[in-house]
Amino acid sequence: FNIMAADQFSSLKRPSGAQDAIFADRNKVTKTVDMQCRRLDTLLPELVAQHGFARPFLKMDTQGHDLSVCEGAGDAIGRMLGVQTELGVRPIYEGGAGYRAMIDWLEARDFAPSAFFANNKGHFPLLVEMDGIFVNRALVRD
């Protein structure tokens, strides 16, 4: 895990060489640490057993790693009532999925956009990233 100069940038991914100059001093690796990662499809049954929920909502903020989290959900993604994800518009992390790829991935699994909103007003007028909320068409009534 990459610990960045500014902790809000810490990520499994390394900083993008194409990141905007305004991030360069804050989004640089100062230390790496080992950590355990688990796939959501193996973790979700444990969480359901522990907390007893029936309609999970997946909220992610994994600093460029959201698509990998969704892929790690396997078939369990279809049990999610909805998903909230960060959608990268400008590159911050190497290998981070852009907003179009993330939207396409979710729509291919029958998740419909419900809302998009900028998650950081400090970079107006150029959008860096936004949050997107998607609902599972199979589980939500029109």
Regions found by a protein language model. Give the residues of each.
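Glycine-rich adenosyl-binding loop in Rossmann-like folds that engage adenosine-containing cofactors
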Residues: 1-38
